[in-house]
């Protein structure tokens, strides 16, 4: 339709018209704060349900009937195929095409048109569209960026998840306090700001003569942690509100210290929700581009490396990076599921 949004307009203005871009960022924040205020007002009279059994959720089953059961199953299968399976297959197939978008082998049925040059080329070849790049398996730029991405994502997840869990616990225990509402609102504030605006703010703050952290993992971790705290704090708060105070009060009567209460009582009861508070920042950080675009050079992490290869026209490399990110997320989610029994497959917080 050729329409623009505030966020896309902000990106187009940010490079040349920083003043106008800052005004747009403030407008977007005002909209976000207004929505958050409306949400808080609407939930003032909400009912709270707590648990004293150690189980924070329940499954409610509904009889869909024979027709409804199969109809919903077919719709879900189709949606899953086009939103999950087909994109992964497309990314994988793109890395074997001789030229971007060349699917001629489908109607010629000649698989010899497919190539593995994008994966296994070891030399700096300038012809065949490689632009002097090694294949994906031997490309040090990609794997160095992958290692850096994992480092940033793990650190952001650990720090943001821990801070968010503590915020959720503190707010839940002092839910009737005005300060608790203030802390909860401030913790959620970074979510209301556009990622590119947060990145620009950290660029101005930490890329100057006195403090220069540009193109360092430290700056990316700081920015990522601040941006992703709302994910962890919201997940932790919702889970902590479900725990009855009587559970912890019984432990306090027994003179059990706070750390032991957390690790032996609170965390085991809400294990799924707390782990979700760590997994959400981790997965978001892996694919983040807007936040880190101004804070590091191309090739420093995978998302900026993907942008670099897109500009070069090496779309097979971009597809491979997308595939690497997807597989990495699936592997980590599976490992967490197997090791802890908690997974995002069952929704935020699990069953």
Give the role of each language-model region.
Residues 24-42, 135-171, 182:
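Transmembrane alpha-helix signature in integral membrane proteins
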Residues 33, 37, 157-169, 173, ...:
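Hydrophobic positions within alpha-helical transmembrane segments of bacterial inner-membrane proteins
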Residues 1-33, 65-69, 95-105, 111-130, ...:
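Interhelical loop and adjacent transmembrane-helix boundary motif
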Residues 1-4, 56-58, 102-113, 130-135, ...:
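Membrane-interfacial helix termini and adjacent extracytoplasmic/periplasmic loops
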Residues 30-31, 81-85, 186-195, 219-230, ...:
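Hydrophobic transmembrane alpha-helices
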Residues 22-64, 170-171, 237-246, 252, ...:
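C-terminal transmembrane helix and the adjacent membrane-cytosol boundary/short C-terminal tail
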Residues 74-88, 189, 226, 233-236, ...:
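Transmembrane alpha-helices
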Residues 58, 65-75, 166-202, 350-351:
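Cytoplasmic-entry segments and transmembrane alpha-helices of multi-pass inner-membrane transporters
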